Amino acid sequence: MINAWAQIEHTLRDNLNPGLFKVWIKPLAAEQAGDSLRLVAPNAFVASWVRDRLMNEIEKAAASVLGSVPTITVVSGEEPAAAPRPVQVPAQKRPAAARTSGAEQMGLPLHYASRSADSIKWMHSFDEFVVGPSNQMAFAASQDICQQSFRSDTLFLSSDPGLGKTHLLHAVGQQLCNISNRTLPRVEYLTAEEFATRLICALKAKEVDRFKARYRDVDVLLLEDVHFLQGKQRMQDEVLSTVKALQSRGAKVLFSSSFAPKDLNDLDSQLTSRFCSGLLAVIEKPTFETRKQILREKARLHHVQLPEQVADLLADNIRADVRQIESCLRNLLLKARLLNQQITMDMAWEIIGHYAKREAVLDIDAIVRQICSGFDISKEQLQSRSRRRELVIARNTAFFLARKHTDLSLEEIGKRFNRKHSTVIKGIANIEREMNKETPLGRQVVNAVNMVERNGRIIHP
């Protein structure tokens, strides 16, 4: 007999919008009372919202798993309840793994209890960050903001995707929680999109005051991907008010973005001013020596000593970003382990063949050509004013690749596609966001990017 709620969750994950699932279904825990299914929400607000808006979807999912619709109730975890018992289904129906405990479900909607250092899963630390000329300033600033002697209350980290912004924000959060003399350090970490989603939920539920209290009564606010706020005036107003309130109390605010403040458009001038009011640290692409050191450190974490020649080869050929460097290394280590062989230069060359080689360059013409081929559209359609969904996705993917692989400025990229540079920024932000989602569209975008990067490179003599 195995837990059925995980299988019901899996069905709901497939049927619901990813954001809806993450905010409202994922926090629920299941209990069995006879033939009834009891869902426990983190608080009364979530329980009420799920009852009013998602009960039909839950009943359909339960019926598809159990064969019939059980009696389903949704209650608040703040109410007294009997000891829970797992919901059971026959063992031949094998669901996905069960959800983690409530303590591990960070960032629940409008769950305002103070959070301890253990309630946020910090994935990275300063000790694991490889420092080089390209990121030295950002690393030092991130460390210093954890100290009382740091004179600024704001830090803005800017870089292309995959160069370490998230790593540093996690490291700051972990460090502050570790050195805090509080039992429950008040730290909030979320993306600008998550902030906006929770604000919308609070507005609909008339819980704005509680929302404000949550984010204005912290010691540190770590807000990622603030370029998402472009063109969203209501969200900008709330972020601005939150930042003002935090700074007036001496709290610290860290922002990250794929764009520098000067490149952000459709943004309130006061908010831009707040972004620029503290220290701005830009992370550039890592140098050869930094890339090599990253490879050594990551190999060490896997208890592998990387041969010097192999490290040189990988560092010299994989230059796009740190994520790609780490991915290449993981594939190399996995291949050696599966084949039960030593890591060799030949094996490394085979793995590099799936990534960008040093002499292979992806220029704007190749990007346009491959995008048109992959999306089955003409160059004229790609550069047209049409807002058809598939054309917008293709165009935004081209923006993303042009910024990643060429030296063209945002304005120059825009001119190539008859667009303003503000449109280019929004398009790139949308693609980055979709690539981080486990959705059909997200997978389509990732596949398109990989296809262009694999097929579109031209070899220079």
Swiss-Prot record:
PROSITE patterns: DNAA. Residues 68-118 are annotated as: Domain II. Residues 1-68 are annotated as: Domain I, interacts with DnaA modulators. Residues 337-461 are annotated as: Domain IV, binds dsDNA. GO terms for cellular component: cytoplasm; plasma membrane. One of its GO terms (biological process) is DNA replication initiation. It is found in: Cytoplasm. Keywords: ATP-binding, Cytoplasm, DNA replication, DNA-binding, Lipid-binding, Nucleotide-binding. One of its GO terms (molecular function) is ATP hydrolysis activity. Pfam families: Bac_DnaA (PF00308), Bac_DnaA_C (PF08299), DnaA_N (PF11638). Residues 119-336 are annotated as: Domain III, AAA+ region. ATP binds at residues 162, 164-166. Plays an essential role in the initiation and regulation of chromosomal replication. ATP-DnaA binds to the origin of replication (oriC) to initiate formation of the DNA replication initiation complex once per cell cycle. Binds the DnaA box (a 9 base pair repeat at the origin) and separates the double-stranded (ds)DNA. Forms a right-handed helical filament on oriC DNA; dsDNA binds to the exterior of the filament while single-stranded (ss)DNA is stabiized in the filament's interior. Domain I is involved in oligomerization and binding regulators, domain II is flexibile and of varying length in different bacteria, domain III forms the AAA+ region, while domain IV binds dsDNA. Oligomerizes as a right-handed, spiral filament on DNA at oriC. Belongs to the DnaA family. This is Chromosomal replication initiator protein DnaA.
